[in-house]
Structure formats: C-alpha cells, structure tokens
Amino acid sequence: GRGLAAALMLGADGVLVGTRFYATQEAAGHAAAKERIVAASGDRTIRGILFDIARRNVWPAPYGGRVLRNEFSERWRGREAELLQHQAEEASRYDRARTAGDFDTAAVIAGEGVDMISDIPPAAEVVTRMVKEATTLLAGASNRYQVSEN
C-alpha cells in the first residue's frame, strides 16, 4: 500500500506488483519458490541473463530479469559467455532442478520489493490490504498538507 500511495502521489497511474502476486495462494508457482520469496531480501536479488541462458530463452540485450541469488547464479555470475558454451548441459540440469523444485539451481523470479513480502495470502487479500493502506495514507497526506493559494 505504501508503494502504491507513493507512486500515485508522484503522478503514476499504477504500480507493478508481480513478485507480490507470485507469492499468493492462487499463483501457479512452486510452493518452495514462494517460501524463498517470503524469506528473501531485496539485496539478495540480481539482474541479468544467467537464467535466460539456462532456460534457452535469451532476450535482447536491454532486457534481463531480476531473480533471487542462488548457488547457480553465484557459480556463473560474470561468466555468461562460458555458460553459453555449456548451455546444453546446464539447460538440462536447470530443467531437472525446476521440475524437482530445486531452487538452489532453478530461478525464483523476484523484484527488489521482495523485502515487503512476509506471507502467502490469497490474491484478493493482497488487493484489499494494498487498497486499504494506500487509501489511508493518501487521506492522511491530504489532511497533513494544506496548499495555500498565496
């Protein structure tokens, strides 16, 4: 709610909350991945193409995903060219890890806002909480600051 209120106060029309909705009961993600999101902090995220290489799905240069750091990322970070040389074997290993719920190897896609996630509620509850907190904060801000026409 705080992030939504802040963004709206700065003139945004909305916010991106993908990680928050990934850690909900209805999301199709693996339960172990959701638990990692709850336990994570924003400084444990990295941005790059390592997991795109492992998934055989490399995006154009300006695009890269943010994921939670894990053993795979620590092993290959800064060695993307070498990973490309081993892509077939690492992709196979990655696929097995993802199927098995092994998130020491498979990616957990998560943004820096992961710090604010502490539970895995129903999605409707996330929306209700977010709207309630944003509404309260926005109402409080309008009461706190009076604009003078002078």
Question: What is each stretch, according to the model?
Answer:
Residues 2-150:
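Conserved active-site-proximal phosphate/metal-binding subdomains
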